A protein has these predicted regions:
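Short beta->alpha transition motifs characteristic of CBS
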Residues: 50, 98, 105, 116-119
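Core segments of cupin and vicinal oxygen chelate
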Residues: 7-47
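Conserved catalytic-core motifs of GNAT/GCN5-like acyltransferases
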Residues: 29-32, 92-94, 117-119
Length: 119
């Protein structure tokens, strides 16, 4: 249903270090890299970070990234923390969302909330 998502960020390279680490753990790669934007994906660019233009603040703050399993959730969470992210909920079961819903939460360098989930 969603073709792509983009976040406006205050420092493109700082945010790229964070997303490079998280996406590497999920098997996702950079597909586009310009002065103003970086896009990640598997077969097509689906997740964009864009250098903030005239907006007064970075964009919307939550996206859920699909992982292949619990180990990938753990690895992405660890990688994000090592790349400047802030823990916003350690990996674990979230029964309020479903019996097998396993997720970890991070805040990226701009404070945008990133969930990594396996179901």
């Amino acid at each position: 249903m969603i073709d792509h998502i983009g976040f406006e960020v205050s420092d493109l390279q700082r945010s790229a270090r964070f997303y490079d680490a998280v996406f590497f753990a999920l098997g996702v790669r950079r597909m586009i890299d310009t002065e103003k934007a970086i896009a990640y994906g598997i077969n097509a660019p689906q997740f964009w970070i864009v250098r903030r233009g005239r907006s007064p603040a970075p964009g919307y703050g939550h996206v859920a990234l699909q992982a292949s399993g619990r180990a990938a959730v753990d690895a992405a969470h660890r990688s994000g923390l090592g790349a400047g992210g802030v823990d916003d909920g350690p990996p674990g079961l979230r029964p309020q969302y479903g019996r097998r819903y396993y997720a970890g939460y991070l805040k990226d360098p701009d404070g945008l909330r990133v969930e990594v989930v396996a179901q």
